[in-house]
UniProtKB/Swiss-Prot annotation:
Residues in coiled coil: none
Keyword Ribonucleoprotein: yes
GO cellular component, one term: ribonucleoprotein complex
Molecular function via GO: structural constituent of ribosome
Gene Ontology biological process terms from the UniProt entry: translation
Identification of the protein by name: Large ribosomal subunit protein bL28
UniProt entry keywords in alphabetical sequence: Ribonucleoprotein, Ribosomal protein
Disulfide-linked positions: none
Family, as annotated: Belongs to the bacterial ribosomal protein bL28 family.
Source organism of this protein record: Campylobacter jejuni subsp. doylei (strain ATCC BAA-1458 / RM4099 / 269.97)
């Protein structure tokens, strides 16, 4: 399975590890994915892998 949020499409980013001696090596920053059950607009529930930031946004929108 790809490490991609199924709602926003947020995926891995590329960056550097930086040591105290300022040596740089490539690394990947992975999104914080969570598997949750999401209730869709038509009333059905579906298991989705979404980013934690997306989950916070959904909770905020549903509370209004």
């Amino acid at each position: 399975m790809a490490r991609i949020c199924q709602i926003t499409g947020k995926g891995p980013m590329v960056g550097n590890n930086v040591s105290h001696a300022n040596n740089k090596t490539k690394r990947r920053f992975l999104p914080n994915l969570r598997t949750v059950r999401v209730t869709l607009e038509d009333g059905t529930t579906k298991k989705m892998r979404i980013a934690a930031s997306t989950l916070r946004t959904l909770k905020k929108q549903n509370s209004k």
